[in-house]
Amino acid sequence: MSKYVDRVIAEVEKKYADEPEFVQTVEEVLSSLGPVVDAHPEYEEVALLERMVIPERVIEFRVPWEDDNGKVHVNTGYRVQFNGAIGPYKGGLRFAPSVNLSIMKFLGFEQAFKDSLTTLPMGGAKGGSDFDPNGKSDREVMRFCQAFMTELYRHIGPDIDVPAGDLGVGAREIGYMYGQYRKIVGGFYNGVLTGKARSFGGSLVRPEATGYGSVYYVEAVMKHENDTLVGKTVALAGFGNVAWGAAKKLAELGAKAVTLSGPDGYIYDPEGITTEEKINYMLEMRASGRNKVQDYADKFGVQFFPGEKPWGQKVDIIMPCATQNDVDLEQAKKIVANNVKYYIEVANMPTTNEALRFLMQQPNMVVAPSKAVNAGGVLVSGFEMSQNSERLSWTAEEVDSKLHQVMTDIHDGSAAAAERYGLGYNLVAGANIVGFQKIADAMMAQGIAW
């Protein structure tokens, strides 16, 4: 590894020892950039990496709101505007009790590289709050969203920072936040948020985008390996929008998802989650707020494994779609023992660094990184921004076609970058290199301003 890269990683580990998720993602990204950094000694001369691992701006604020009983609660809100060298900040808002500064910085850092990979002019950001929408009434969620936007509005704009949804933030929450934004600023600037309802500027295919895009990426991997999706079995984790979109597109292309997981365990459906009834039931489960994947097992009479993860099932493809660090070294060893060939990260950083290194050492396994695989979500968000700017609405076929093409290009570009630096078919390193190079070029061209 490059001495410069080693030094910056060591500095980050020391300075941010209390931010483990952020340190983990910095280590994962920078550790693959040695060949690029060594080829450009000018990067060290202008402290490029040191600047790149520090956000351009971190906004932290209190969010007071009142519940239905008149009791006042206070949550913490965040917006980490990590890197805007190539365009307005772009990235989701997450409402979950687990939200903290380390997770926001990790997601913002990853987002910068992901947005760069899309080829669209978007910088990287992430935000959210430790507010838990589960168990709250619709009015309570509305009041919280309004309180959150009452502070956030001053930091965002169509050409400044364009938030979107993420875990705990769907079209409902985006709608409430946009309503408050419109009231405060006094104008119809619908390009300020993406993930909106169709009635006021949302894009077709946005709910399915991350899942669809992940499968299009797998399709490109299959083409490279002279293989096909037809007949493949897939283990999915999660049962939200991403897993739903993936299951839907897998079925359409002739493969079948056979697992889903939740906080309570996982289900195994050997016949596959391929029918319209089963795929639509995933949406019903999520909308119920019960957060139990066992409901699927009860309805369709399949096996449920309480408190377990699906990584011990023998399948062709693994696609973790749930949350960060879902696959540790122990789980990775189970995956390898089952001779799984394709390990496709879909959730943000779903694999511990230790497990990722182990999987990448397997000679017969293809490992694909989340920042490339799940780029479809932010890609269609970028398409939504374009439609809002043009005052036009694209057809579903047009959006899907563009999504398919760009996801294929992301795979092909990553593979080519890895080959160019003598790394073989290393999609993890290739994605990091491509994402980094565009940001680095922009930062170098703009001088030492950030």
From Swiss-Prot:
Annotated EC: 1.4.1.2
UniProt keyword annotation of Kinase present: no
Residues involved in substrate binding: 90, 111, 114, 165, 381
Residue positions of the active site: 126
Pathway annotation from the record: Amino-acid degradation; L-glutamate degradation via hydroxyglutarate pathway; crotonoyl-CoA from L-glutamate: step 1/5
One GO MF term attached to the UniProt entry: glutamate dehydrogenase (NAD+) activity
Annotated Gene3D superfamilies: Glutamate Dehydrogenase, chain A, domain 3, Leucine Dehydrogenase, chain A, domain 1, NAD(P)-binding Rossmann-like Domain
Residue positions binding NAD(+): 210, 241
Stated name of the protein: NAD-specific glutamate dehydrogenase
Originating organism: Clostridium symbiosum (Bacteroides symbiosus)
Upper classification of the organism: Bacteria, Bacillati, Bacillota, Clostridia, Lachnospirales
